[in-house]
């Protein structure tokens, strides 16, 4: 399978409707943004004829086709999984892309429904939310930590989360992930190598280091539910960016979701007072 991507050089508003039309003919397609350079909008996972797609998009001087790089994922199955998860999220949220129309309460409601459906034993749908919030919190200065925590606490007290019906069929990616695990083509840290992560030693916190060093023997390492949550969240962060949701709100979403399973405020307050990092679950799920 030879995938290509399309990078847009000009006004994305002109192409918005045409891009959405491609979802009907490109089963792996998803919308993304460059991570460096000009951060241009792009669509990836394209398999169709370039001339045919160009005719659909129109205004052919506003975009270019390039070959999809193959140096990030360990195998083609990982890339297809990546495409499928992004594609599912695009179909839910693309009406809000390149605009400022989405409500944060709706996104949090969606995340809560996803987390509840992914969780089957303990905290599979929530663990990565706490991990990402804690990684962010740990990078802040002492003053920033206190400031952000107080802002999040106040915002949390006032937020009214929307009841958002689950709009994604998670059975399909779960089945795919299970098959890939059984074939040794996927684990929790894919597409990265656990050995290389340990060797590099770039840990976000002591909790993160402890988790990484003991990962190979852990429950989450080859858990299809933990893996789906991690991959889905990484795709969701692209979706948030495309909806013009500020980065700080991304971490607030993590905070809100983590509060469902962990005493986040207590963990943060203890860290601020003692410098001790400790993660524990709420009693009702232990």
Residue ranges of model-derived segments:
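An acidic, charge-biased composition feature
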Residues: 1-286
